[in-house]
């Protein structure tokens, strides 16, 4: 029962998904819209509750057991609690019951997002430029014909795609566009076919119950 | 230490320092760099330009804070273009962590326009000229659902208004009333728009993506599934150039300002790779 | 130089520097910033799920407008929380099965249409494809190159036979196209990563320190 019911459900739900695309008839669309608009939307919201519950449990557990770096978990919980209170009671557009400004100092949820989430996330990715430069210098070696081709194509794109491409030759940007439009498309398209066939095969395996990793461990 | 050893073992701090220098100096001492638009960006610009009065444009701001630097200038350029030419525009995000960036872009451009507006007609009025639909999960719901009814999916907009009570939404009901959707993203979302909304409802999809996805997206541009394509900061700079050249819209051009830094940084990376390989060849020859 | 007096700009900048300090090595400032990020990002998420999904889509219609059909998604959704009750935790598989099943079901025809049929149409040698390049007679040449390139690339990824003879030749040609594609992707990736660094510096040097405009 613990496996049969979920496997039957995934088969039925998968079939409904396929049918919705193959038979776009209005009489069926009513049901399809209900599945998408009501069922899937609500399920996605509860999935977030599960994810959040897991995150908080991990950090409470870390504090309780005083695991390595447990002090930082307090920071996470305080930041989460503070921003959730501001968002839930202060409203999405600072329209809630909780005041979200003291004088000219605002602390509504959008302000927190713009001044904490954005700078932190963008800084994490800004680091990648340094690591990429260092890795390219250390690891990019012309050992074979394939590596040479890759390097030449990369250099042409790096130079030709920028304004300096025109300074070198007025034909260079056009040549870069040709590389992207013709040989690049041929190579990428072969990969697109491979990915698409892989997606279809995996989806079929999931719906037909051949792929069961999503059931997780246990009975 | 032999020459080839020196060439192959430059300290990472030197590499970081050089990179930081070549990126920073052109920002502090800027000079004008002429950006020439390429055809994929021109096609996108034309498609947005061709939106007729009876139709609206959807701007999907599904880019995360991590890639803000690359994609936000695209959102601002497209919004400036659409507002300047008085297109009706709907803005949305497909993921919750991205909706704050859409809010930021809209607030910035609306403020730019309204600070220069002389009359009520000139001003950008919420509900009349643009609607911020906000976000509804999971992405498949708006992608397919808006083909039937936009206000059924976005029952309330970002600000909590009932969407069907907004003036603009009286005429904009579903994809039949949309000329093009411009998907700005750092992931495979534009392909999902094609797979769901275009296949089923024939929606035209234009794309602005991070440079990481650029080469992967060309097969979809070549088939016409993507009406136009803006790739990375350079693509954003090209769109900024088109908006200013065609409509004289003045405003800070963040992507264009970055072109010189980008140029020097590319040259530095090429140099690093060349130096590493010279060391590698000398080493191989000795062996 | 015109340093910002906005306290939020200072907070953003200090948090940014804490993350960038990872370049030196992992340190407590980086770890603190990382945890603050996770906390605030999840607080933001909760806000929107409550105000824009659960309230207008579920609770208000169900409890205020009496749309009783919503009891079904509500009940199935609640099953997600059984994950925290070991004795009945298997019930979490029910909402996952419905969600994942429908999604994968829709994905199959959509993928076949968008990524296989349309891509094949863009590859075959037809007059429409020749003209789509807007390059006159060269359009035929470009289409032929794409056609040959796609076939050869596919043959490179065909591992059911040894790459000898005809397949050996086509797979060698295929790898040329793949490598050009990867090269273009690498070139663009460099641009992407540098752009993100520029964005960060534009903020630190401009909005914070006021060194640049």
Annotate the PLM regions.
Chain B
Residues 66-131:
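Membrane-embedded segments
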Residues 127-216:
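Membrane-proximal low-complexity regions enriched in glycine and acidic/polar residues
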């Amino acid at each position: 029962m613990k496996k049969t019911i979920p496997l039957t459900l995934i088969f039925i739900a998968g079939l409904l998904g396929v049918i919705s695309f193959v038979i776009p008839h209005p009489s069926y669309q009513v049901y399809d819209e209900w599945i998408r608009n009501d069922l899937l939307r609500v399920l996605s919201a509860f999935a977030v509750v599960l994810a959040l519950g897991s995150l908080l449990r991990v950090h409470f557990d870390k504090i309780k057991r005083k695991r390595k770096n447990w002090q930082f978990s307090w920071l996470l919980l305080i930041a989460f609690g503070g921003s959730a209170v501001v968002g839930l009671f202060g409203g999405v557009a600072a329209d809630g019951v909780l005041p979200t400004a003291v004088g000219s100092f605002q602390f509504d949820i959008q302000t927190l997002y713009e001044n904490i989430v954005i700078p932190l996330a963008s800084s994490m990715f800004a680091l990648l430029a340094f690591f990429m430069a260092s890795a390219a210098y250390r690891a990019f070696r012309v050992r074979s014909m394939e590596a040479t081709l890759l390097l030449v194509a990369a250099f042409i794109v790096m130079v030709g795609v920028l304004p300096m491409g025109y300074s070198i030759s007025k034909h260079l940007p056009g040549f870069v566009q040709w590389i992207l439009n013709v040989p690049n498309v041929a190579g990428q398209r072969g990969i697109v076919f491979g990915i698409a066939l892989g997606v279809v095969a995996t989806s079929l395996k999931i719906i037909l119950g051949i792929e069961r990793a999503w059931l997780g461990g246990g009975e | 230490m032999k020459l080839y050893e020196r060439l192959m073992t430059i300290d990472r701090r030197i590499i970081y320092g050089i990179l930081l220098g070549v990126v920073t100096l052109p920002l502090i001492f800027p000079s004008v760099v002429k950006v020439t638009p390429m055809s994929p960006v021109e096609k996108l610009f034309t498609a947005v330009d061709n939106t007729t009065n009876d139709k609206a444009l959807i701007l999907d701001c599904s880019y995360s804070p991590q890639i803000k630097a690359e994609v936000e200038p695209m959102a601002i350029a497209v919004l400036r273009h659409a507002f300047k030419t008085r297109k009706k525009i709907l803005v949305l995000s497909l993921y919750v962590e991205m909706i704050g960036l859409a809010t930021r872009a809209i607030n910035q451009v609306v403020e730019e326009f309204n600070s220069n507006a002389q009359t009520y007609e000139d001003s950008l009025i919420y509900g009349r000229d643009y609607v911020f639909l906000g976000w509804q999960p999971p992405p498949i719901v708006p992608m397919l659902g808006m083909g039937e009814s936009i206000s059924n999916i976005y029952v309330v907009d970002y600000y909590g208004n009932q969407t069907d009570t907004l003036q603009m939404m009286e005429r904009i009901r579903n994809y039949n009333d949309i000329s093009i959707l411009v998907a700005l993203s750092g992931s495979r979302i534009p392909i999902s728009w094609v797979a769901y909304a275009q296949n089923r409802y024939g929606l035209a999809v234009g794309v602005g993506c991070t440079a990481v996805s650029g080469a992967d997206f060309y097969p979809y541009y070549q088939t016409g599934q993507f009406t136009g394509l803006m790739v990375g900061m350079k693509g954003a700079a090209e769109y900024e150039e088109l908006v200013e050249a065609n409509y004289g819209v003045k405003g800070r051009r963040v992507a264009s300002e970055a072109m010189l830094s980008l140029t020097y940084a590319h040259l530095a990376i090429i140099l690093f790779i060349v130096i590493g390989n010279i060391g590698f060849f000398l080493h191989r020859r000795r062996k | 130089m015109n340093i910002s007096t906005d306290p939020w700009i200072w907070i953003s900048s200090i948090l940014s520097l804490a993350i960038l300090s990872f370049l030196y090595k992992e340190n407590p400032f980086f770890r603190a910033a990382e945890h603050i990020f996770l906390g605030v990002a999840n607080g933001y998420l909760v806000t929107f799920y409550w105000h824009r999904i659960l309230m207008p889509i579920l609770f208000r219609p169900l409890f205020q407008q009496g749309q009783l059909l919503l009891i079904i998604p509500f009940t199935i959704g609640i099953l997600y929380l059984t994950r925290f009750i070991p004795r009945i935790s298997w019930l979490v598989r029910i909402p996952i099965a419905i969600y994942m099943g429908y999604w994968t079901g829709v994905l199959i025809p959509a993928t076949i249409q968008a990524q296989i049929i349309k891509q094949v149409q863009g590859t075959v040698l037809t007059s429409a494809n020749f003209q789509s390049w807007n390059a006159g007679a060269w359009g035929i040449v470009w289409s032929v190159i794409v056609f040959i390139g796609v076939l050869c690339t596919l043959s490179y990824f065909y591992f059911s036979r040894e790459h000898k003879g005809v397949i050996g030749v086509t797979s060698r040609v295929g790898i040329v196209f793949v490598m050009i594609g990867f090269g273009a992707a690498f070139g663009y990736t460099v641009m992407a990563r540098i752009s993100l660094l520029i964005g960060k510096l534009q903020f630190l040097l401009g909005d914070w320190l006021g060194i640049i405009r």
